[in-house]
Amino acid sequence: MPGTEEALTDVRDRTRSTALPDWVAAVVTFLSSGAVLVLEIAGLRLIAPYVGITLQTNTAVIGFALAAIAVGAWMGGALADRTDPRRLIAPLLVAGGALVVAVLPLVRFAGSLLTGADAGSVLLLAAVAVVVPAALLSAVPPMVVKLQLASLAETGSVVGRLSGIGTLGGIAATFLTGFLLVAFFPTSGILVGTGLVTVLVGVAVGVLLRRRTGGVAGRVPPALLLLALAGSLLAWVAPSQCQAETAYHCARVVADPERDTGRVLVLDTLRHSYVDLADPTYLEFEYVRAIAAVTDATAPAGEPLSALHLGGGGATLPRYLAAVRPGTESLVIEVDPGVVEMDREQLGLAETDGLRVEVADARVGLGQEPAGERDLVVGDAFGGLSVPWQLTTVEALELADRALTDDGVYVANLIDHPPLDFVRAELATLRAVFPHVALLAPDAVLAGEDGGNVVVLASQQSLPLDAVGAALRDQDLTWQVASGERLDAFVGDAEVLTDDHAPVDQLLTPYAAPGS
């Protein structure tokens, strides 16, 4: 019918005259979708100084982000059917961008008031970090789709094209943030930059729509611009626990008020290492003294060792070995280049032929080690909130065993709390690889009544456990040595961890029970 075709053509022409140019619609969809993914990744790093990076924090941030995307898209589509999208797209972009900026001071102020990293704190900070701005930005793409539709004949191509562009925006933002932005910019810069770019695009879209509609649509309330400005200003004054944001941690070095030359390396929420700048033989942490006791008992005094350290931290033990066993050759494998830089700049780490540092994943480093050359392999990469599971398995321990000499010793620091399922599972895994295994821990831990740091040791040869016990006492420790039947009773029927199944996040109890 000629009349109907002319009418449809007229409708399409009028729609196109008030819609966004195709390239602008693509940019808006790409940006709004990408900003949500930048927020998700940066939001995880933003809350890490207060609650750590664990399976729970990852789950909370991802879960809230997905929920916000779903709610935002649903509400954006519903509003687009009830209200002219041209009135809402620009304000939503500006509001979403302003809140991306504002979450930085909001999380920092909220985090500074928290006293623990319990599940409630994790959920609260994750929600503050992502929910509202992600929902607002996710409402934009369905509105753009509605605005660009000229006729039912184009629905499939318009929806498909803009949906694909939005997905590409999310993919690009994910790779850009994970591989580049995090490496070169602090979290604060990433969030403020992303938010302000989104605000500016929103303002530009508003100007364009006002021109195309004669001022009917595209107005941005001044209050939203003030929110973006206020958020940017507050971002500079909000309290931050970080001296440096590394690729993996919020890191800082704290001076010991009771020891002039003492320094503590704090990563996220935990004290990871203590270094005495003047005396490398001073060992503050009990677990480090326990590992030192193992080295004292398993090798003649002063004899140099060939040692591999999985996890660097403040490099306390390598420095100790260099001081008490001159000629020792230590290779430290540390995954975080930012931590290594802080070691060099603030903790006085000087690399020599006898103390080398390699930036790499410890599991990868283990796989590259030549066979049968190490007298000692030290596992010190396990934290109190999260565990690099790839270092806990039979396959990883087989690599450690391969690197050791025939009478070499593997020793590792573990952290767990009752019911101590992770420690039990790791001991069971060690026993699947090494015939001689022992546990060093306080009596209360061995009784299952308390938690904290423990030290495990293993070898293909029998261990001098009496000498280890004496060395513990020499290090002013009241820790006990558990082996044989006592260790059997402690381990029980704990599962052996493998690369195929290592549920360490579920086994680990990162916090002491209230009142314990």
Each language-model region and where it sits:
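Alpha-helical transmembrane segments of multi-pass membrane proteins
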Residues: 1-244, 255-259, 269-272, 303-304, ...
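Short, contiguous strand/loop micro-motifs
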Residues: 30-31, 278, 384-387, 413-414
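Short gly/ser-rich anion-binding loops that grip negatively charged ligand groups
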Residues: 88, 134, 277, 281, ...
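The AdoMet/dcAdoMet-binding core of the Class I SAM-like
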Residues: 94, 282, 289-409, 418-422, ...
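Phosphate/oxyanion-binding active-site loops and adjacent basic polyanion-contact surfaces
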Residues: 137-140, 283-287
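Composition- and surface-driven signal marking solvent-exposed, interaction-prone regions
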Residues: 195, 392, 425-426, 469-472
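Soluble small-group transferase modules, centered on the S-adenosyl donor enzyme superfamily
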Residues: 215-274, 280-284, 297, 441-516
